[in-house]
């Protein structure tokens, strides 16, 4: 498979959302708001074949489903702590990194913010002059509904958004290719990117 196809598939099926831990980390601790991202089966091996590895920094962690990242069915799973949801779902202190081992170039997505109301995921990108860029579009934002559950004993309210589908934001594909030193037009504009689940915990104010 040509490098172009490898990179397109790799970035088209990611999330995002980080150090390797057991896949059992998929469940957040009680009371800890979290964004979970999972790549499509085969992404890890495709990235490896293309010389691009995906990892996280800061408070985020990751796990691998399957035998290894080189296995055909291997999947990355990212667990990114939510630090606030007053102005978008914020992940202060967590970075998602694409690293091209062929040339040591990297793309960092720092402190990503999920704007559920507008259907956009933004992040600060140091390699783009520290600009805050629209990185992803939530393609099903208009139909994404919150599921709310309450534990009155624990005075806990849980708000879950399950199955947010993501694609590259318009125009960002060319920037990713350029920053990683990939051939021009390696990524199609608005390519499918993956999915994410968001779980928010808070006090149950309803009596």
Where do the language-model regions lie?
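N-terminal charge/polar-biased segments
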Residues: 2, 17-22, 205-207
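N-terminal segment immediately downstream of the Sec signal-peptide cleavage site
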Residues: 24-87, 163-207
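Bacterial N-terminal signal peptides that target proteins for export
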Residues: 1-8
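Predominantly extracellular/secreted and cell-surface proteins with exposed
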Residues: 61-143
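Extended amphipathic ligand-handling, pore-lining, and cofactor/metal-binding catalytic surfaces
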Residues: 124-174
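Bacterial N-terminal signal peptides
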Residues: 9-18
